Amino acid sequence: MRLTHVKSTLILRSLLVYLMFSRIVFAHDVHEPASYQVQEIAQGNFVHVGAFPPHSLENQGDIANIGFIVGETCVAVIDAGSSLHVGSMLKGAIRRVTELPICAVIITHVHPDHLLGLNAFTSDNSLTVYGHHRLPKQIRTRSRFYLESLEQYLGEGNTIDHTIDSSLVTPVNGLLSIDLGNRVIEIRSWGYAHTDHDVSVTDLKTGTFWAGDLVFSEHIPILDSNVRQYDEVLEELQNLDIQHYVVGHGPLDRPWDVLLTEQRRYLGVLLKEVRAAIANDVSLMDAVNTVGWQEREKWHNFDLYHRRNVTTSYTDLEWED
């Protein structure tokens, strides 16, 4: 049964998750309110573009593209940012645009740069938090570690909420429509892709597609799920009629089809070369230093995340029939 191998794999995966997310540096003074900028990429769709370099003291972990959609009666927030303070800055940006109530916060997936600002919004009992039907389990499994890491980086004298309540999440399984007032948005849950619990948001009025981390722009894609099924999701995204888009990381001014073609090429390299490594009895420790390195100059933050992607692919594909 290769139990020793299974245990080693689980330990290595846990270590890699720790190394990935412990790099996030947080601080209370990420932005002054007036400097927290949002841009209107389509009528009623406002985006804060996160810092594009890797996590650093300078950008304080504010690296995700997050934002909000304004209807005639209320506002929907898409992702809450990397900390309570970043979430509060996003909330302040909303108030500079409109006084309409916030009726929905949609968390595209559990990763801390999208999740940990949630408590900036949940004090308002009139709003609803939405996420994938598998999101509550992921919050219960991961959020304590994320929050403890956040507190460590904030340092003494800063107070944070120590829990994110998974029971607040209204689960989405399939398609869910929300009317913000003469503006209907659709939340869609996906299968295994960037994670096993991604959702996207589409503003039907403007054709604006909020991809979360299903799609990256110039930033190396990050795999926390199944490489084969991720590519299938991207193929489906290529067939959507999208007028405007928001990706989870990176610039928003490149052609949509180019982004997907580049990302599918990278995942295809992972799939082909990891399978070949397994067939030739190349160890995981050797594979992470050989598979896919011809892609290095094509992606930002390659050195930070590529080995992790190889590891995730290897530990999945070694069990395929």
Where do the protein language model's features map onto the residues?
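Conserved beta-strand hairpin/beta-sheet module of binuclear metal-dependent hydrolase folds
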Residues: A42-R96, V199-A211
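Bacterial N-terminal signal peptides
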Residues: L12-R23
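Active-site HxH/HxHxD metal-binding segment of metal-dependent hydrolases
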Residues: G87, G92-T170, K272
